[in-house]
Amino acid sequence: MRASQSPMLDPRARQLLRTLIARYIRDGEPVGSKTLAQHAGLDVSPATIRNILADLEDVGLLSSPHTSAGRVPTAHGYRVFVDSLVQMQPPGEEEVRRLRAELASGNGTQSLLGSASQMLSAMSHFVGVVSAPRREQFAFRHIDFVALDARRVLAILVFADNEVQNRVIEPRRAYEPAELERVANYLNAQFAGRALADIRACLLRELRMAKSEMEQLLAHSVDLASEALVPADAEDMVMAGQTRLMGVQDLSDLDRLRELFEAFASKREILQLLERTIQAPGVRIFIGEETGMVSLEDVSLVTAPYAANGQVLGVLGVIGPKRMAYDRLIPLVQTAADVLGAAMESPGTR
């Protein structure tokens, strides 16, 4: 979480703000001074509470709906709450067991990502989202080349996590089947278990240093690998539970909901937001306008990077209304990131 430009609040104001936001998140109704007098645990009169609430409204942490005598938090109020007032409720043992069971090591990467997004959605009751690792970060296990015609070659890549990608490439020249087999055998023997970027760089380096008898094979390998081992445009993000937001009271404006679902469909804006958080350790929270995207102004996004073997692979998180249970969802997202990262360290997935 990041620090915010928060006003200095005395202990009574902090306690009232904490109680008001917690009650509003729970009930979804504006909170008045009488309710706070009963539940804030302060020995002060309702009149004093009203004065403090007025001060909190003056500094932009609360607002007063026209139809109610109570108050509700603003986006700034939520920011102060998550940065300094929220009291975390980590997932229970049963929830952690569920996560570990669903994200069991040994499953393929795409299966793990799908399970992670579904579990986040089910446990948050909102939208679960997981950005996929770039294929360039994965080791490849095996490659085959099949000539399709005089100019096109099918490259079949099997990665260490058992995912298979088929890529049609157009090398600089036509290749005989025997040549393709020779190049595939060379790449498999020399580079199985290494990441794609490492292989391309190593091939170019070896070509510069090669002796004459190796130059032709290396040149052919560079020609084919320059296209076959470039990361393909794959599924960049997995989402689950989008329709859960259709029944959320705070997201009842149909025009804004339509904009939100268009962002879900295109994925581009959300993926860009996730990319902004990939190098930031721990949980990050974007509340409303903090996302920088009009389509996401009515929601909050709670994210955390997941990593395996010391390498950050992607980001996962929950998208929901600003009125969400931050105390529960912040530690849930961090736990899910830890469990997914541990599963990705398995030999069956990396």
Swiss-Prot record:
Molecular function as annotated in GO: DNA binding
Keywords, sorted A to Z: Repressor, Stress response, Transcription, Transcription regulation
UniProt-listed InterPro entries: GAF-like_dom_sf, HrcA, HrcA_C, WH-like_DNA-bd_sf, WH_DNA-bd_sf, WHTH_HrcA_DNA-bd, WHTH_transcript_rep_HrcA_IDD
GO biological process: negative regulation of DNA-templated transcription
Function comment: Negative regulator of class I heat shock genes (grpE-dnaK-dnaJ and groELS operons). Prevents heat-shock induction of these operons.
HAMAP family per UniProt: HrcA (MF_00081)
Family the entry assigns: Belongs to the HrcA family.
Protein name, per record: Heat-inducible transcription repressor HrcA
Gene: hrcA
